[in-house]
Amino acid sequence: MSTAAAPSFLRQLFAGEIASDLLFPYPPPLDRRDPEEAETVRRLCAALNAMAASGVVDSRRFDEQEQVDEGAIRAFAEAGLLGISIPRAYGGLGLSATGYARVFGAVAAVDPSLAVLVGVHCGLGGKAIVLYGSEALKQRYLPALARGETLGAYALTEPETGSDAANIVTRAERDPEGRGWLLTGRKHWIGNGHRAGVLVTFAQTPVERDGATVLRPTAFVIRPDFPGFQVAGTIRKLGIRGSTQAELVFDRMLVPDDHVLGEVGKGFRVAVHALNAGRLSLAAGCAAAGKRLLGEFTRYAEARVQFGAPLASFEVTQRKMATIAAETYATDAMVGALASALENPAVDASLEAACAKVFASEMAWRTADELVQLAGGRGYVQPWPYERYLRDARIQRIFEGANEVLRLFVGLNGVQGPAAELQELAQALRRPLQHLGTLTGYAAERVASALGQRAGLEVPLHPVLRPHGEAFERQAAELAAAAADAVMTHRREVVHRQLVVERLADLAMELYARACTLARTQQLIGERGIGACGHEVALAELFCAQSARRFRTVHRELTGQGGATVDRLRLAVAAAVRSQGGYLPADALLDVPLPSPPAWGLSREAQEAAVGLVPAPSPEVAPER
């Protein structure tokens, strides 16, 4: 049976194959691959630490002022931190994905708001021009972005279109005078949007497909001095308050033809590839946050004495400490593997990027939540920083694609391989003599599955890791079988069975995290010897054991009757709640109507009133010079 043509560890895992060569051997540290780049990364990290020590970067100040001040941005520009993803040919540092991820993690550890600013500037806006810009666009805009003379932005999200990026409503039509494109629409939550001098945005354009005119997204490079561009205001937020998100208005904004990014009608490809880089950034930032927060967790637990002993001496605290450490180790392993995959243009790492983003963001949220819980009342109030950590962590599950949507993205893409195989099988069954080879191959696969034969890692693991490798192989086979069964059971309706697809994604995510963890730990053992890797082995063993247990729980829900029964009950209750607009039963103590919350109207005026747009300051950073 065939698998997806583009190499992808997860796509092949769904199809019952373990593409060991895509993860093993784990990529060596950067200083062994590129000593010169490693030295650059060290210099940048040292500059970041110096900025934090001197007060140039001050998370508390940024949070209270609700902006990153110009002094910090200038310091970043002077250090070269605004050109890390831009090739050297255009004045940047041209870091690899690995180097970029390491620097971005350091930025996130210093201040999450600055990480958002840098991520939007380098990882989204600048990266899209690097990947898809014409040579003229690159020459025109990348040097200024690399020097930090202006900031970059990435304007995709709209008031009515968040994760459903393919269905944006901003329209682009041809200018009657032939000067280019006229864009009309609004963009929401645009990081750096109020002071960026170069922005990448998206609009629906009419294109010909199969003899009919249809609307497809196109990417454009725009500037705030284009006629029709307006910043409606900036937005106050729960967390990452130092970063600024703006609402932009395009009122028949004129964009020249030479500012189309990529091809007309193929903007979705631009968005997806830029978001892969953005998801790497986010995962790297969350991994760094996990390391920093674990340090704070440990220090507080050792210092805080209750019942005559430090909190760190209690088993419940130690359980939390160990789980945070193991999950951070796994996240770090995923970031290293993903960065290496994104450096290989022949590899499709879109599913892996989505999994890393989901896993990392949820790890960071749990870690921040546990730190607040550990600190008790101090975790909830200022001037202690713990409540800010929690507020800053919350957005990660929404940025770069909401986690619920990314789970569906992973699950639905994963079942495409089994679906194609089963479609091929169905055709063979209609004409069995003409497709004897297909039937024989499918029968052989089923017989092998029944006999317990399965794809293997095909790499030597140290004996201490081997049991976890064998568990991985068993559960990889279970994922492939569950994906095939889901397609056979639900057929075309599988795309609507989101609870099933979500579980498949959770299984895949656990396996990917575990494979990365095993690969990295095996690499460390090979380099240092088992005697020098005791802590890493303990982390890997703990993570693999906990991950395998989570896998078994989800797999039982997916393949047993219990999960289907619970799903039916959930959908029935949800239907009743929807029909009544909320909670139905009478109050158990005394049935007294609750006060109604303020109405959230759906009109544009009501939304703006609810959000409370703040008039945007005049940009202090000039656009194109």
Specify the residue positions occupied by each region the protein language model found.
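Amphipathic, small/basic residue-rich leader segments at the start of a protein or domain
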Residues: 1-119, 127-151, 163, 458, ...
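Glycine-rich phosphate/cofactor-binding loops in nucleotide/flavin-utilizing enzymes
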Residues: 3-23, 273, 378-465, 559-625
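C-terminal helix-coil-helix/basic helical segment that borders enzyme active sites and/or dimer interfaces
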Residues: 60, 302, 329-359, 372-374, ...
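Glycine-rich phosphate/pyrophosphate-binding beta-alpha loops
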Residues: 112, 188-194, 395-400
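Extended, hydrophobic alpha-helical segments in both membrane/secreted and soluble proteins
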Residues: 125, 137, 150, 185, ...
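A structural signal for short hydrophobic beta-strand segments in well-ordered beta-sheet cores
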Residues: 170-173
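A short core secondary-structure module
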Residues: 179-231
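Glycine-rich beta->alpha junctions and the first turn(s) of the following alpha-helix
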Residues: 230-328, 396, 403, 412-418, ...
